[in-house]
Amino acid sequence: MLLGAQLRRLREACGITRDAAGFSIRVSAVSINRMEMGRTSFKTRDVEDLLTLYGITDEAERDTLVDLARDANLAGWWHRYSDVLPNWFASYVSLEGAASLVRMYEVHYVHGLLQTGAYARAVISRGMKGLSTTDIDRRVALRMERQKILQSENAPSLHIVLDEAVLHRSCGGRDVMRGQLQHLIELSERPNVLLQIMPFSFGGHAGESGAFTILSFLEYDLADVVYVEQLTSALYLDRHEDVAQYGRALKELQQESLGPEASRDLLRDLLHLQ
């Protein structure tokens, strides 16, 4: 999806239609659309030909995008969880793993990257009633596997704003919440993590429309992607005006939230009350 979005931006920037792009590599406009949506594999030669058509001559830029094409054709670790991973979320997991900066605002639950196993199990069991124990175990395992990027050599930076409501919404009982609060405190002390709490005391704010995540790919010099999850699907926004608006909203949320130390103090206070 990362490569497809970049190919679409390059095509649109030079005013070439999908029909014309498809003609140049002997495929239909529908096939070009599928490529740009990240819903098909990429032939390296096709990507090279499209880059030439789009006027991309810089060797470093071409190499980066061709490397992305090769990577996109490799089965990611998350394919092992295809039985519990819908296609619309598999795209997010792929992007999350490639991001160098993940910024998020959460209003209902702790973000999946920050959840303990017990908290994840409680959230999944509550939100997806009727699942078998095996399916719940698989979904928890997937969530824990995603978190391995936080331990990797190239761990992304995390900028997190949690609405205080997240911390008061009990999931799994007292012991589970104690473990989750302690985990957030420990995460907040990492050098690559900036965690802030939007307190109840602050009224209307820029995040009233709901949770969202902004993924940045500084290593690849690619545009940011905004992820907005829905009940049975998700929005992936990468157009400049959309990304800019969400970026401004997150900046306002950060300015209006408690600072990192005050947020840690609030987490400690809530932990002591459990």
Where would I find each of the regions flagged by the language model?
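C-terminal regulatory/effector modules of DNA-binding transcriptional regulators
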Residues: N154, V161, C171-Q274
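Short glycine/serine/threonine/alanine-rich loop segments
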Residues: I16, V27, V193
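Interdomain hinge/linker segments and adjacent boundary elements that couple functional modules
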Residues: M1-R9, A13, R18-F23, M37, ...
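Short acidic (Asp/Glu) and glycine-rich catalytic loops that position anionic groups and cofactors
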Residues: R26, T44-E48, V225-E229
